[in-house]
Amino acid sequence: MAAAVVTKTAWKLQEIVAHSSNVSSLVLGKSTGRLLATGGDDCRVNVWSVNKPNCVMSLTGHTTPIESLQISAKEELIVAGSQSGSIRVWDLEAAKILRTLLGHKANICSLDFHPYGSFVASGSLDTDIKLWDVRRKGCIFKYKSHTQAVRCLRFSPDGKWLASAADDHTVKLWDLTAGKVMFEFTGHSGPVNVVEFHPSEYLLASGSSDRTIRFWDLEKFHVVSCIEEEATPVRCILFNPDGCCLYGGFQDSLRVYGWEPERCFDVVVVNWGKVADLSVCHNQLIGVSFAQSTVSSFVVDLSRVTKSGSVPHGLLRNNELLAQPTPTGSSLRRSYDRPSTSCSKPQRVKHSSESERRSPSSEEDRDEKESKAEIQNPEDYKEIFQPRNAISRTPPHINEPFPAPPEDEPITAKEAVKPNQPVEVQTPLPKQELPETFQRPPIASSTPMPRAEPSVIPAARNEPIGLKASDFLPALKNQSQAELTDEEIMSQIRKGHKTVCMVLTSRHKNLDTVRAVWSTSDMKNSVDAAVATNDLSVVVDLLNIVNQTASLWKLDLCTVVLPQIEKLLQSKYESYVQTGCTSLKLILQRFLPLITDILAAPPSVGVDITREERLHKCRLCYKQLKNISNIVKNKSGLSGRHGSAFRELHLLMAVLE
């Protein structure tokens, strides 16, 4: 009798080259989990069917890179926001642009469709939230309360509320009919990246860069619980459709949470890097991530994931396995009711001005004429969108779940998709023959051309930096070559190992030095010690800690850090640039008004040593900020996340010009 085939819990479904340039955003359709939209620096929106290699439709019209995307609940419409602040809505069934919406003054950071009405909400780097009527192609309401970029917007399931998350560390709940903030949730110590409503209960979840997930009661307006001490910032969360648990997408892992009390039900290792969006369908979770121009999709079999009951990983408190308390309160929390038809659209809307309510018609008409929906694959397009226009059949057609591949070998723990595991990639690859055994590399007859390195090395990458993959791959067949011995193969594998160990040992020693200074002295001396090591990686590690606590920043600390920030902003490593931008933003928000006020103040009568010292520090900081402002101005034209960060810094530094 044949043994039962053991299938994988998580596996890589597909990898595609989605754009001719870097991918800047993507989104999954939540209804079927089979529709994927990607936006790129090439100013295009490409629509894909998950697990199919070819682009179904390419939407053009934007003139700047795509910053945010959203697909409607019925997967009939798609909205895209660009770097310039323009918004375009396409009808996927009709394959044409529906509306062009203008009004924001900066990048579009977040978008969401109203669940019932023809409305779209948009959040921007300009801190405004706007509600648009797609049918009338105008802004019907503008919500102003946030002080920094609005990173996520979500309508409540009944369509009456709107939740917004922003870089100002707050989550706000808006009453659409009244046009005002119902409540402001505070508690996060870092930018809030994502919010999600529970599908049925009055419960809201928020994830932040402070590496916590907070659950908020929307009836009593208080925090229900908080999941802390995650390893990475929280950027992607999703409630299970039945509301039994919350999924958190983290760096190379999926975590399953409960909230009353806070606990982690399960952890599944998935090699998806920084996952960008999640969707649940047919008891499978689909996750998508992107790196440069490629998009990867992954599947997790939820039937093999613990979603309630036992707590295999224990409560998230001091990393100790505790007994599971009896859940309380969830059965008493109110549930959403679908509003009547008259409530499906906001009431008491205010039109501040006719010019704001409507976009300029001549410019809009021209943009809509230039916007196109290019059908790249007619067969897939008809299969996905045309059946909606046909007569419904009974029972209706339902997409089958993705088949799980078998395990490579028997194991006891849940296996992740391994980096070296062969994966079927359906993008065309150059044809070449590879031998089955290692062979000696051919002796080069001439000096090889150096490989061009990227101008910016991304934080998420598929291969180590500084290692040549060709050293570890089989070479082409050559009759004059002899097969490598096992010793020679191991020698190639170990190549560079000693160098890496020396680098890590030196870095560890430097960090120990900084930690020793920090434990016996103040923050400025710790930063001085980090700068003295002449190792930017140590400075980055220290700044990543300091950036989490704004109260640690002092004026004398700025004089030491600003020269290092200037170096970080010009680094080729993305993570260094991100840390430099975060530190500079904190300095500008906390100290730039103080610096300008002190420099503009008239000289005092008599001798004031304290004031003279403060004036000297302010002059030094001002000079350094002027130097950095030139770098920020030159880089503000970049596309993608870097460009957004530099443009925000450029706005904050406008007073220096």
Swiss-Prot record:
Q: Quick check: keyword Ligase in the entry?
A: no
Report the InterPro entries cross-referenced here.
Answer: G-protein_beta_WD-40_rep (IPR020472), Katanin_C-terminal (IPR028021), KTNB1 (IPR026962), WD40/YVTN_repeat-like_dom_sf (IPR015943), WD40_repeat_CS (IPR019775), WD40_repeat_dom_sf (IPR036322), WD40_rpt (IPR001680)
Does the keyword Magnesium feature in the UniProt annotation? no
- Coarse class of the primary localization is cytoplasm
Q: Biased composition, Basic and acidic residues: where in the chain?
A: 351-385
**SMART domains listed in its UniProt record:** WD40
Which windows of the sequence hold WD repeats? 18-58, 61-100, 103-142, 145-184, 187-226, 229-269
Q: Which UniProt keywords apply?
A: Cell cycle, Cell division, Cytoplasm, Cytoskeleton, Microtubule, Mitosis, Repeat, WD repeat
Give the Gene Ontology MF terms in alphabetical order. microtubule binding
Report the record's Gene Ontology biological process terms.
cell division; microtubule depolymerization; microtubule severing
**Bias regions of kind Polar residues — which residues?**
325-345
Tell me the compartments it is located in: Cytoplasm; Cytoplasm, Cytoskeleton, Microtubule organizing center, Centrosome; Cytoplasm, Cytoskeleton, Spindle pole; Cytoplasm, Cytoskeleton
Cross-referenced CDD domains, in alphabetical order? WD40
| CC annotations in GO | centrosome; cytoplasm; katanin complex; microtubule; spindle; spindle pole
Disulfide bonding pattern of the chain:
none
Q: Which family does it belong to?
A: Belongs to the WD repeat KATNB1 family.
Annotated function: Participates in a complex which severs microtubules in an ATP-dependent manner. May act to target the enzymatic subunit of this complex to sites of action such as the centrosome. Microtubule severing may promote rapid reorganization of cellular microtubule arrays and the release of microtubules from the centrosome following nucleation.
Q: Which HAMAP family match?
A: Katanin_p80_B1
Q: How does it assemble?
A: Interacts with KATNA1. This interaction enhances the microtubule binding and severing activity of KATNA1 and also targets this activity to the centrosome.
User: Can you name this protein?
Assistant: Katanin p80 WD40 repeat-containing subunit B1
Q: Report the source organism.
A: Gallus gallus
**What would be the name of the gene that encodes this protein?**
KATNB1
